[in-house]
Amino acid sequence: MGVVHDVWVVTKQLLEATALPWPAEERETWLSQVDELLRRRERLLHKLRPPYSEEEQRLGREIVAWNQEIEARLRQVRDEIRDDLRMAGAKRQANAHYVHPYEQPLSFDGMFYDKRR
């Protein structure tokens, strides 16, 4: 039961690491920890070889169920990061309008269109 149990242990650590709320200030630390756990689990998954005992099959079903929870949490973190990047871009653009107000027009509402030309 060695390799399957090791995969189960690493997956459980990964589940615990992704289940906690990640403050934005500590996100980089959490991401590096999750990345290391994913790399360790990947190395162990390459060592898995059948046949599996009943206990190993039970652990495997548990691993699959946990993996779905882990994927859902990582998708949520990805969306949070995407939103933060989008907000940072919007703030940067708004700041650029304040620094250089006449460089780009904010709107074209007051434009005059000459039909003759």
Swiss-Prot record:
UniProt-annotated location(s): Cytoplasm, Cytosol
Major location category of this protein: cytoplasm
Role of this protein: May act as an export chaperone for the filament capping protein FliD.
GO cellular component labels: cytosol
Family that this chain belongs to: Belongs to the bacillales FliT family.
Keyword vocabulary terms for this entry: Bacterial flagellum biogenesis, Chaperone, Coiled coil, Cytoplasm
Chain segments annotated as coiled-coil in the UniProt record: 24-88
Name of this chain's protein: Flagellar protein FliT
Single biological process term from Gene Ontology: bacterial-type flagellum organization
Quaternary structure and partners: Homodimer.
Highest taxon, organism lineage: Bacteria
Keyword Ribonucleoprotein (UniProt): no
